[in-house]
From Swiss-Prot:
The modification N-acetylalanine is found at A2. It comes from Homo sapiens. A zinc finger (SWIM-type) spans 338-366. GO terms for biological process: cellular response to mechanical stimulus; Fc-epsilon receptor signaling pathway; protein phosphorylation. The active site is at D1369 (proton acceptor). The lineage of its organism: Eukaryota, Metazoa, Chordata, Craniata, Vertebrata. SUPFAM superfamilies: ARM repeat (SSF48371), Protein kinase-like (PK-like) (SSF56112), RING/U-box (SSF57850). Coiled coil: none annotated. Its EC number is 2.7.11.25, 2.3.2.27. Belongs to the protein kinase superfamily. STE Ser/Thr protein kinase family. MAP kinase kinase kinase subfamily. Residues 1-13, 81-99, 129-142, 150-160, 250-260, 416-433, 611-624, 939-949 have a biased composition (Low complexity). Changing L189P: In SRXY6; increases phosphorylation of the downstream target MAPK3/MAPK1 compared to wild-type and enhances binding of RHOA to the mutant MAP3K1 complex. CDD domains: RING-CH-C4HC3_ZSWM2, STKc_MEKK1. This is Mitogen-activated protein kinase kinase kinase 1.
C-alpha cells in the first residue's frame, strides 16, 4: 500500500513530486522511487481535515474568478482536469499509476504569457504534469457548459497536499494563500513596464490558441495514455478533440518517440519567469491603454468595400519613409508624389479625410485588415503609431536579412527527407515561414503580390529580394530626380543591374542594320541637327529591359523589329506609359537620323564617316532609297497603332514622331506622293477617331494636327521641310485630308469615327473657306467652270454630313445638322448652291430632313432669296459667270431694328476691266491707316466681295454662344480684300507662303485663312489691345468717321479657334444696342486712284468674317479711346486683370508638337544684321519697361466700391475711431458714436480666422446691411499706464494709416470702434483666406499663380513705399486672397510686430515671431538701420513660400526662434530657391534676396521685369 501510495505521489500531478527529487530536474528522465515509502508515510501521518478545507477554499476561489472573467475572453483556455480516482485495489501497478494522477488537487495548466514561454528554463509548464497529447480536459470548452465538480480528494492525497504547502514554494508558482486581488495588481504593475509593441505581439500570438503543456511520458510507448483512455473515455476524447477543433496549432512533437524533452508550443521566443495566474483564465494581454476614438467607417458598407478595393488595386508606390511618422507615396507619373503623415492621418494631396494615399499606407504598407477600426480613425495615439511602425520595420528587416534561411531549410528538408531538424525548427517553419513567404512574395514598392508572369527583377548584391520591374523603374526615376545613386529600396545596397538608371547611348552594333548607319552618322552631324537632337540622343531603352510583345501583335510587329529592333518595338507594347513615351522619342530620333542619312544630309564629311563605318555601303545610291522606304513604311505602320494610345503624353510623342518622319521624307514625284499618301492613310484614320476624343486636349490637338496637314507645304507637317533644297511637291493638303475623310465609308453605328470626321469637317469649313466657298475669294471671272463644280468639295462634305443627320447618337446628329445649316448660311449669296442644298434635303422625308428643309427656307426668306430660288433664278441670270458675286439682297435689308445686329456691306463695284478688286479708292497705306482703328468683334460679318450677311437670330445671352469665325488672310489673293486687322494671337496665325511656293496653292486658295473664334479673354488682354488702339488711333476726322461700329468695347484676341460653345458669355454681350442709324456702314471703294499690284494692295493681315447659324453681334463704343481709369466697372474683370489669357488653355499642334527647326547655314550678312538689329536694344527695352509699368499702374488704379456700414461712417475731419457709449472716457480724441455699434447687437461675431499676439481676427456680419466683414479685435489693456498709452498710440496709428490707404492690392478698412477694452477694426472680407492658408490646404502654387500674386504684391508695396510706409511683415499669412482667387491684398500693417517689440512675457509671441522671422531681412534681425528694401527681401521669401509651400530657411524645422534669428542674421548666402522655377521668376527672387539692401531694386523697378510683361 505504501509502495502504491509512493508511486502515486511520484507520478501524480503535483509539481512537488519532481521538484523535490534531485534527479527530476530539467532532463525529463525516469523518476526514481527510492524515497517513495518515506514520502508516503509522511503524507499518511499528516492526513486530516485541513487539507480538505484548503482544497475547498481554492476550488471556490477558482470558480469565482472563472465565472467573472471567462465570458470576457474571445476563446476559452484549456484546463487540465484529472481523471476520477480509481479503486485502490487495482489489479496491476499501471492502473494504480493512472489512479494516482487523479488526486484531489486538480492542478491547472494555465497558458502563460507568450512572451514568457520558451524552450528551456523552469516554469509552470515543467512543474505541472499532465497527460500526453490531447489528454487535457476542456473544462471551459463551451461557455455555457456546466462544469463537472472536481473529484473528492482521497484520504491519502490530502496529507500530500499539506506536505507540499509546508515545503518551499515551487519555482514560478505563487502560494495559493495569495489573494487574487494582490496577484491582479502585481500583473498590472508588470504590464505597465511592457512596451506597446510587446502588447501587440502578445495579442497576435494569443490568437493562435492556448499553450497545451506536454508532460514527460512515463513510458515511451504511450501505455499511460491508453489506460487513461480506458478510465475516462469521455474526457479524453473531448480533450483530445479540443486542440484539433480550434485549428490553430499543429500537433506537438511530443507524441513522437524522439521527443523526450518538455517544450512549450511557443517556439523561437525567449522565456521569462512570469508567475502564472490561474484565476485569469487564459487572459494573457495585460490591460491596454484606451484606443483612439472614431474607429468606424464614415461610409456605407458598400462604399467602404468599394474604397478598400480601389486602394488594393491602385497603382501607387511606396517611395520612402521621409520622416519618423511619414511616407512619400508616388504614382505612375514621377511628378505625382504625396506625403502621408501617420498619427494626424493626413496627406499632402488635400483631398479630405481618408484619401486613397492614406488608405494605401494603412492597408498595403501597414497591412491592416479592412475591418480594423484603426483604419478609420481620424487620429491615432502615439502608442498606436509606434505599434504600426514597429510591425512595419520588423517586416522589412526580416526581408533585408540575407536569403531566408528557413526557406532554404524547408527546401533542404523536403529534398532529403532528413529528420535532423529539431521539433522546434519544424514548428517554426510551419508557422512563421508561411508569413515570411507571403512577405517575400510581395513587392516592397507597390505592396502587391508578384506573379510568375510579371516582369521581375532582383537585388543581386544585397538582400536578393525580387521586385516588380515596373516598380523598380519608378524607384530608379525617383533616385535620378534626387541625384542619388540607384540603390535597393530594401537593403540600401548599390544596385548592380544596369537595367535602370542608365544614360549611355546604345552601341550601334545592337541596332538593326537599317538604322546602324543612321546612328553612327547622327553622332557626327549634331551641329546640323542642333541642340534638340543633342538633347534627345541622351536616352536609352536598355534600362527598361526586354518587354514582351503580346501574341496577337507578333505578326504585326515582325517587320517593325526588322527595321527598329526588338528592344524598341517591345517597349512600344509596355504597360507603363513612361516606357512607351520614351520608346517613341527614341523612334523619332532613329527615324529622323535614318532619313537624314539616306538623303545624304551631313555636315560635309559624310563620305569619310560613312566609309569608315561598318555600314558605309548603306549610304549610297539605291540602298539609301530602300532604307528610307523601309523606315517610312515601318514608321507609318507603328504610328497607325500608337496614335490610338489613350495616354496624352504618349499621343504627343507619337505626333512628334509623325512630324519627324514627314519633315525628313522627300517627295519629288507623283509616284512618291501616291505611296506616301497610301502609307499615311491608316495614321490619318486613327487621328480622325481622336478628333472626337472625350479628352478636350486630345481632340483639339488631333484637329490641329490634321489642319497642319491640310496646309500642305506651308504647315508644320510639310513634307521634306527640314531637308535642304528638298523641293518636295507635298502630300496634297486639303484634298488629301478630304479623301481620307470621305474615302473610307464609316458605318453609321461607329459613332466615334463619324463624330471625329464631323468635328474636323466643322473646322475645315472655317479654316479653309476658299476651298469650299469660292465666292469668299475673288477668282478670275473669265473661268468657265460651272458653279456646282466649283463647289464640289463643299457638296461632297455636306453629302457626308447629310448621311448622319438621322444618326442615333445625339452628338453626331447635332453636329451634322449644325454643319449643314452653317454652310447653307454661307452660300445664301449663291442661290445656285443654296437651291442644291435644298434639293439634297428632299431625298428623305424623315423628321430631321423636314425640319432642316424648313430651316433652310426660313433662311432663304430671311435674306429674301426664296423667290429667286423658286423661280429658278439660275437660268435667268443673263449668263453672267460671276453672278454669285452680286449682292442679291435689297437695300432695305441694311436697315436694322432695335433687336438686330449691325451689318456691314462692302461694295466692290465693276469698272471697265470687270470687277475692280485691285483698284481701291486710296493707297493701301491710307486704307491701312483708316482701318487701324477698326477691330473685329466676335460676330462681325464682313465678306470680301459684294456680300451682305443675313440677319442673325436675336441675341440669346443666356446660352452664351457667340460663335464667330474670323479668317486671317495673307497677301496671296489676287484681289484686294477689305477686312479688319487681325487680332489673333501668334498661335492662330500662319506664316505667309513665299512666292516660290505659291504654285502649291491650288485654285488661288488663301493659305493664311485661319478662323479665330473670339471667346471672352481676360480683361488684362483686352486692356492691352485697347491701349494699342489708343496709341494707333489717327488724330483726324477720317478716323472719327471710321470709328468702329462693329468693334467690341474690349477687343478679345484669342487663338481658341474651335467651334464648340464658349465656357462663358462674352462680356460685351450685355452692352446696349447701338443706334440703328449708326449700325450700318458702307465703304464705297470706287476711286480713280489705281493699285495695279495685286500682291501689294493688301499689305496688312486682314480678316474675313463668316457668320454661323448662331452668330451674335455686339455693338461697341463710339470712341476708340478708352479711359483706363474708368474702364473697370466689374469686380470680375478687375479681379482677372492679371490672370493668364484664356488662349493659353488652347491646345494646338504648334504649342504641343512643333519644335524649332534645326539651324540652317547662315549667310555672311547674318552677323551684321544681328548687330544692326541689336544696336538699339537697350533703348527699346527701356521703352518696353516703361510701357509695362504704365500699364501695371493704370490697371491697378481703380477698384470695386467698398460696402458702406452706416454706423461706421464719420464726418470729414473726425477721427475714424468711433468710441461706444459704454466705453470709459480714458481714451480722448475719438469720435463719439452717434449710433451704437455694439457686438452681438448691431454686428455679430462669427468663427475665428486668425490669432495674433494681443489680437484675434473673426468673421463678422453687419446686422443692418448683411455685409460680411473681418473684425480684428485688439485689446489695449496693459499692466502699466505708460505701456497702455504706447499700445493705444500704436493702434491709433495703424487704424488711421489704414483709413487713408486706397489701392486694389491693399486691404481696406470699413471702420473702427472702441468698445470696452477692445479696439475693433472692421476690414473687408477676403473669402479666399491667406496665401499661407491656401498653401497648407492645396499645396504649392503653379508658377503662373506665383507670378500673378507676386506682381500684385509688388504693386501694393510700390503704393505703400510711395506713401512712405514700410510694411515690415510681408509673409504668406498677411497676404489675403478674394473669393475668385485672382485678387491679392496686403493686410496687417505691422502693429502686431510693434506690439511684440514692446517687451512682452517670455515666449508669449514665440509662435507668431517664428512665422515672421523667416521672412525678415538680415539687416532687420541684426538691428541695423533698414528701409523699404526690407519689404523687397520679404517678397523674395514670399516667392519661395508660394513655390514650395513652406517658408524659407527651413523655418518649420527650427523650434527655437533664437537659433533661426542667428542663422538668418549671420547668413552669407540667400535662402535656397526652388530649382523648378523658370529663369525669369528665379531672377526676380534673386534680385529680391540680395544680401546688401542697397543692391535690391525698388518694388517699382521690379514691376518692369520681363516675367511680368509676358502675361499682358
Amino acid at each position: 500500500m505504501a509502495a502504491a501510495a509512493g508511486n502515486r505521489a511520484s507520478s501524480s500531478g503535483f509539481p512537488g513530486a519532481r521538484a523535490t527529487s534531485p534527479e527530476a530536474g530539467g532532463g525529463g528522465g525516469a523518476l526514481k522511487a527510492s524515497s517513495a515509502p518515506a514520502a508516503a508515510a509522511g503524507l499518511l501521518r499528516e492526513a486530516g481535515s485541513g487539507g480538505r478545507e484548503r482544497a475547498d477554499w481554492r476550488r471556490r476561489q477558482l470558480r469565482k474568478v472563472r465565472s467573472v472573467e471567462l465570458d470576457q475572453l474571445p476563446e476559452q483556455p484549456l484546463f487540465l482536469a484529472a481523471s476520477p480516482p480509481a479503486s485502490s485495489t487495482s489489479p496491476s501497478p499501471e492502473p494504480a499509476d493512472a489512479a494516482g494522477s487523479g488526486t484531489g488537487f486538480q492542478p491547472v495548466a494555465v497558458p502563460p504569457p507568450h512572451g514568457a514561454a520558451s524552450r528551456g528554463g523552469a516554469h509552470l509548464t515543467e512543474s505541472v504534469a499532465a497527460p500526453d497529447s490531447g489528454a487535457s480536459s476542456p473544462a471551459a470548452a463551451e461557455p455555457g457548459e456546466k462544469r463537472a465538480p472536481a473529484a473528492e480528494p482521497s484520504p491519502a492525497a490530502a496529507p500530500a497536499g499539506r506536505e507540499m504547502e509546508n515545503k518551499e514554494t515551487l519555482k514560478g508558482l505563487h502560494k495559493m494563500d495569495d489573494r487574487p486581488e494582490e496577484r491582479m495588481i502585481r500583473e498590472k504593475l508588470k504590464a505597465t513596464c511592457m512596451p506597446a509593441w510587446k502588447h501587440e505581439w502578445l495579442e497576435r500570438r494569443n490568437r493562435r490558441g492556448p499553450v497545451v503543456v506536454k508532460p514527460i511520458p512515463v513510458k515511451g510507448d504511450g501505455s499511460e495514455m491508453n489506460h487513461l483512455a480506458a478510465e475516462s473515455p469521455g474526457e479524453v476524447q473531448a480533450s483530445a478533440a479540443s486542440p484539433a477543433s480550434k485549428g490553430r496549432r499543429s500537433p506537438s512533437p511530443g507524441n513522437s518517440p524522439s521527443g523526450r524533452t518538455v517544450k512549450s508550443e511557443s517556439p523561437g521566443v525567449r522565456r521569462k519567469r512570469v508567475s502564472p495566474v490561474p484565476f485569469q483564465s487564459g487572459r494573457i494581454t495585460p490591460p491596454r491603454r484606451a484606443p483612439s476614438p472614431d474607429g468606424f467607417s464614415p461610409y456605407s458598407p458598400e462604399e467602404t468595400n468599394r474604397r478598400v478595393n480601389k486602394v488594393m488595386r491602385a497603382r501607387l508606390y511606396l517611395l520612402q519613409q521621409i520622416g519618423p511618422n511619414s511616407f512619400l507615396i508616388g504614382g505612375d507619373s514621377p511628378d505625382n508624389k504625396y506625403r502621408v503623415f501617420i498619427g494626424p492621418q493626413n496627406c499632402s494631396c488635400a483631398r479630405g479625410t481618408f484619401c486613397i494615399h492614406l488608405l494605401f499606407v494603412m492597408l498595403r504598407v501597414f497591412q491592416l485588415e479592412p475591418s480594423d477600426p484603426m483604419l478609420w480613425r481620424k487620429t491615432l495615439k502615439n502608442f498606436e503609431v509606434e505599434s504600426l511602425f514597429q510591425k512595419y520595420h520588423s517586416r522589412r528587416s526580416s526581408r533585408i536579412k540575407a536569403p531566408s534561411r528557413n526557406t532554404i531549410q524547408k527546401f533542404v528538408s523536403r529534398m532529403s527527407n532528413s529528420h535532423t531538424l529539431s521539433s522546434s525548427s519544424t514548428s517554426t517553419s510551419s508557422s512563421e515561414n508561411s508569413i515570411k513567404d507571403e512577405e517575400e512574395q510581395m513587392c516592397p514598392i507597390c505592396l502587391l503580390g508578384m506573379l510568375d508572369e510579371e516582369s521581375l527583377t532582383v537585388c543581386e548584391d544585397g538582400c536578393r529580394n525580387k521586385l516588380h520591374h515596373h516598380c523598380m523603374s519608378i524607384w530608379a526615376e525617383e533616385c535620378r530626380r534626387n541625384r542619388e545613386p540607384l540603390i535597393c529600396p530594401l537593403c540600401r545596397s548599390k544596385w548592380r543591374s544596369h537595367d535602370f538608371y542608365s544614360h549611355e547611348l546604345s552601341s550601334p552594333v545592337d541596332s538593326p542594320s537599317s538604322l546602324r548607319a543612321a546612328q553612327q552618322q547622327t553622332v557626327q552631324q549634331q551641329p546640323l541637327a542642333g541642340s534638340r537632337r543633342n538633347q534627345e540622343s541622351n536616352f536609352n531603352l536598355t534600362h527598361y529591359g526586354t518587354q514582351q510583345i503580346p501574341p496577337a501583335y507578333k505578326d504585326l510587329a515582325e517587320p517593325w523589329i526588322q527595321v527598329f529592333g526588338m528592344e524598341l518595338v517591345g517597349c512600344l507594347f509596355s504597360r507603363n506609359w513612361n516606357v512607351r513615351e520614351m520608346a517613341l522619342r527614341r523612334l523619332s530620333h532613329d527615324v529622323s537620323g535614318a532619313l537624314l542619312l539616306a538623303n545624304g544630309e551631313s555636315t560635309g564629311n559624310s563620305g569619310g564617316s560613312s566609309g569608315s563605318s561598318p555600314s558605309g555601303g548603306a549610304t549610297s545610291g539605291s540602298s539609301q532609297t530602300s532604307i528610307s522606304g523601309d523606315v517610312v513604311e515601318a514608321c507609318c505602320s507603328v504610328l497607325s497603332m500608337v496614335c490610338a494610345d489613350p495616354v496624352y503624353k504618349v499621343y504627343v510623342a507619337a505626333l512628334k514622331t509623325l512630324r519627324a518622319m514627314l519633315v525628313y521624307t522627300p517627295c519629288h514625284s507623283l509616284a512618291e506622293r501616291i505611296k506616301l499618301q497610301r502609307l499615311l492613310q491608316p495614321v490619318v484614320d486613327t487621328i480622325l477617331v481622336k478628333c472626337a476624343d472625350a479628352n478636350s486636349r486630345t481632340s483639339q490637338l488631333s484637329i490641329s494636327t490634321l489642319l497642319e496637314l491640310c496646309k500642305g507645304q506651308a504647315g508644320e507637317l510639310a513634307v521634306g521641310r527640314e531637308i535642304l533644297k528638298a523641293g518636295s511637291i507635298g502630300i496634297g493638303g486639303v484634298d488629301y485630308v478630304l479623301n481620307c475623310i470621305l474615302g473610307n465609308q464609316t458605318e453609321s453605328n461607329n459613332w466615334q469615327e463619324l463624330l471625329g470626321r464631323l468635328c474636323l469637317i466643322d473646322r475645315l469649313l472655317l479654316e479653309f473657306p476658299a476651298e469650299f466657298y469660292p465666292h469668299i475669294v475673288s477668282t478670275d471671272v473669265s473661268q468657265a467652270e460651272p458653279v456646282e463644280i466649283r463647289y464640289k468639295k463643299l457638296l461632297s462634305l455636306l453629302t457626308f454630313a447629310l448621311q448622319s443627320i438621322d444618326n442615333s447618337h445625339s452628338m453626331v446628329g447635332k453636329l451634322s445638322r449644325r454643319i449643314y445649316l452653317s454652310s447653307a448660311r454661307m452660300v445664301t449669296t449663291v442661290p445656285h448652291v443654296f437651291s442644291k442644298l435644298l434639293e439634297m434635303l428632299s431625298v428623305s422625308s424623315s423628321t430631321h430632313f423636314t425640319r432642316m428643309r424648313r430651316r433652310l427656307m426660313a433662311i432663304a426668306d430671311e435674306v429674301e432669296i426664296a423667290e429667286a430660288i423658286q423661280l429658278g433664278v439660275e437660268d435667268t441670270l443673263d449668263g453672267q459667270q460671276d453672278s454669285f458675286l452680286q449682292a442679291s439682297v435689297p437695300n432695305n435689308y441694311l436697315e436694322t431694328t432695335e433687336n438686330s445686329s449691325p451689318e456691314c456691306t462692302v461694295h466692290l463695284e465693276k469698272t471697265g476691266k470687270g470687277l475692280c478688286a485691285t483698284k481701291l479708292s486710296a493707297s493701301s497705306e491710307d486704307i491701312s491707316e483708316r482701318l487701324a482703328s477698326i477691330s473685329v468683334g466676335p460676330s462681325s460679318s464682313t465678306t470680301t466681295t459684294t456680300t451682305t450677311t443675313e440677319q442673325p437670330k436675336p441675341m440669346v445671352q443666356t446660352k452664351g454662344r457667340p460663335h464667330s469665325q474670323c479668317l486671317n488672310s495673307s497677301p496671296l489673293s489676287h484681289h484686294s480684300q477689305l477686312m479688319f486687322p487681325a487680332l489673333s494671337t501668334p498661335s492662330s496665325s500662319t506664316p505667309s507662303v513665299p512666292a516660290g511656293t505659291a504654285t502649291d496653292v491650288s485654285k488661288h486658295r488663301l493659305q493664311g485663312f485661319i478662323p479665330c473664334r473670339i471667346p471672352s479673354a481676360s480683361p488684362q488682354t483686352q486692356r492691352k489691345f485697347s491701349l494699342q488702339f489708343h496709341r494707333n488711333c489717327p488724330e483726324n476726322k477720317d478716323s472719327d468717321k471710321l470709328s468702329p461700329v462693329f468693334t467690341q468695347s474690349r477687343p478679345l484676341p484669342s487663338s481658341n479657334i474651335h467651334r464648340p460653345k464658349p465656357s462663358r458669355p462674352t462680356p460685351g454681350n450685355t452692352s446696349k444696342q447701338g443706334d440703328p442709324s449708326k449700325n450700318s456702314m458702307t465703304l464705297d471703294l470706287n476711286s480713280s486712284s489705281k493699285c495695279d499690284d495685286s500682291f501689294g494692295c493688301s499689305s496688312n493681315s486682314s480678316n474675313a468674317v463668316i457668320p454661323s447659324d448662331e452668330t451674335v453681334f455686339t455693338p461697341v463704343e463710339e470712341k476708340c479711346r478708352l479711359d483706363v481709369n474708368t474702364e473697370l466697372n466689374s469686380s470680375i474683370e478687375d479681379l482677372l486683370e492679371a490672370s493668364m489669357p484664356s488662349s493659353d488653355t488652347t491646345v494646338t499642334f504648334k504649342s504641343e508638337v512643333a519644335v524649332l527647326s534645326p539651324e540652317k547655314a547662315e549667310n555672311d550678312d547674318t552677323y551684321k544684321d544681328d548687330v544692326n538689329h541689336n544696336q538699339k536694344c537697350k533703348e527699346k527695352m527701356e521703352a518696353e519697361e516703361e510701357e509695362a509699368l504704365a500699364i501695371a499702374m493704370a490697371m491697378s488704379a481703380s477698384q470695386d466700391a467698398l460696402p458702406i456700414v452706416p454706423q461706421l461712417q464719420v464726418e470729414n475731419g473726425e477721427d475714424i475711431i468711433i468710441i461706444q457709449q459704454d466705453t470709459p472716457e480714458t481714451l480722448p480724441g475719438h469720435t463719439k458714436a452717434k449710433q451704437p455699434y455694439r457686438e452681438d447687437t448691431e454686428w455679430l461675431k462669427g468663427q475665428q480666422i486668425g490669432l495674433g499676439a494681443f489680437s484675434s481676427c473673426y468673421q463678422a456680419q453687419d446686422v443692418g446691411t448683411g455685409t460680411l466683414m473681418a473684425v480684428k479685435q485688439v485689446t489695449y489693456v496693459r499692466n502699466t499706464s505708460s505701456e497702455q498709452e504706447e499700445v493705444v498710440e500704436a493702434l491709433r496709428e495703424e487704424i488711421r494709416m489704414m483709413s487713408h490707404l486706397n489701392h486694389p492690392n491693399i486691404i481696406r478698412m470699413l471702420g473702427a470702434t472702441c468698445e470696452k477694452s477692445n479696439y475693433n477694426l472692421f476690414i473687408e472680407w477676403m473669402a479666399g483666406g491667406s496665401v499661407a492658408h491656401l498653401l497648407s490646404k492645396y499645396g504649392a502654387f503653379k508658377e503662373s499663380v506665383v507670378i500673378n500674386y507676386t506682381e500684385q504684391l509688388l504693386r501694393g508695396l510700390s503704393y505703400l513705399h510711395e506713401n512712405q510706409i514700410i510694411h515690415r511683415d510681408v509673409k504668406g499669412a498677411n497676404l489675403l486672397i478674394d473669393s475668385t482667387g485672382q485678387r491679392l491684398r496686403i493686410a496687417d500693417f505691422g502693429a502686431a510686430a510693434r506690439l511684440a517689440s514692446k517687451g512682452t512675457g517670455a515666449g508669449e509671441f514665440q509662435g507668431q515671431l517664428l512665422g515672421t522671422i523667416a521672412f525678415m531681412a538680415p539687416e532687420v534681425l541684426r538691428g541695423q538701420q533698414y528701409g523699404r528694401s526690407c519689404d523687397v527681401w520679404s517678397v523674395g521669401c514670399a516667392i519661395i513660400e508660394m513655390a514650395c509651400a513652406k517658408p524659407p530657411w527651413n523655418a518649420e524645422k527650427h523650434s527655437n526662434h533664437l537659433a533661426l534669428i542667428f542663422k538668418i542674421a549671420s547668413a552669407t548666402t540667400a535662402p535656397s530657391i526652388p530649382s523648378h522655377l523658370s529663369p525669369g521668376l528665379r531672377d526676380v527672387a534673386l534680385r529680391c534676396l540680395e544680401l546688401q539692401p542697397q543692391d535690391r531694386p525698388p518694388s517699382r523697378e521690379l514691376l518692369k521685369h520681363p516675367v511680368f510683361r509676358t502675361t499682358w
